[in-house]
Curated annotation (Swiss-Prot):
PANTHER family from the UniProt entry: NAD(P)-BINDING ROSSMANN-FOLD PROTEIN, TROPINONE REDUCTASE
NADP in keyword set: yes
Organism the protein comes from: Arabidopsis thaliana (Mouse-ear cress)
Protein name in the entry: Tropinone reductase homolog At1g07450
InterPro entries per the UniProt record, alphabetical: NAD(P)-bd_dom_sf (IPR036291), Sc_DH/Rdtase_CS (IPR020904), SDR_fam (IPR002347), TR (IPR045000)
């Protein structure tokens, strides 16, 4: 067996929003497979706490403050990444996202602008800025962290629109940038047990509504998302591009009221 197919040794990665939840798990998984990782986050205190913890473990992780919804800060971020990694980048994980759970008639123009800027605009322009670095690496990979609500209807139209757009962006970039040896895929998790979601998981009514139609009958764990994301970046996944892969415990394929 060629073990290099299952290694990220010598590769570089940028993970946006890497200091908590799914992003944090992705960082640890990428490092575990040998990658050098740079993260960005808007929370300086949390970022520094994570970096201290990782450095204590001997992980090669660096970080910088960035509000990805800000164009100047996105440009500065990519300049930093270029300087750190010798103008080359193998892996870009567009992980940053937020949600505002409102139905259409209750959503405001401010809600729309905020979600579009953070969830979609940031991923679009960071990918654009990263293109020269990804191309220069000779083996570029982009993974968008989407959501099941970008595949099937959910409880927030704006949030779902941003995530559905990420899925389409993965398809478009997969075709447009294939000649530059850049792959692009989207990972669409179902409800994931992060600190932000934990309060909802403790609500029995919410949990019943979410998991009564989920064959595996539970929330996804951040490390489970991280495993899929990392696999897509491995040489072993070199023929996978333009895909949206749901990691949802069977939720999107359950066509009847299944009770786990």
């Amino acid at each position: 067996m060629d073990i290099n197919r299952w290694s990220l040794q010598g590769m570089t990665a940028l993970v946006t929003g890497g200091s908590k939840g799914i992003g944090y798990a992705i960082v640890e998984e990428l490092v575990g497979f040998g990658a050098r990782v740079h993260i960005c986050d808007i929370d300086e205190t949390l970022l520094n706490e994570c970096l201290s913890g990782w450095h204590a473990k001997g992980f090669e992780v660096s970080g910088s403050i960035c509000d990805v919804s800000s164009r100047p800060q996105r440009v500065q971020l990519m300049q930093t990444v270029s300087s750190l990694f010798g103008a080359k980048l193998n892996i870009l994980i567009n992980n940053v996202g937020k949600y505002i759970l409102k139905p259409t008639l209750e959503s405001t123009a401010e809600d729309f602008s905020s979600l579009m800027a953070t969830n979609l605009e940031s991923a679009y322009y960071i990918s654009q800025l990263a293109h020269p670095l990804l191309k220069a690496s000779g083996n570029g990979n982009i993974v968008f962290i989407s959501s099941v609500t970008g595949v099937v209807s959910g409880t927030s139209t704006i949030y779902g629109v941003t995530k559905g757009a990420l899925n389409q962006l993965a398809r478009d970039l997969a075709c447009e940038w294939a000649s530059d040896n850049i792959r692009a895929n989207s990972v669409a998790p179902w409800v994931t047990a992060t600190s932000l979601v934990q309060k909802y998981l403790e609500d029995e009514i919410f949990a019943e509504a979410m998991f009564s139609r989920t064959p595996l009958g539970r929330a996804c764990e951040p490390r489970e998302v991280a495993s899929l994301v990392t696999f897509l970046c491995l040489p072993a996944a070199s023929y996978i591009t333009g895909q949206t892969i749901c990691i949802d415990g069977g939720f999107t394929v359950n066509g009847f009221s299944y009770k786990p």
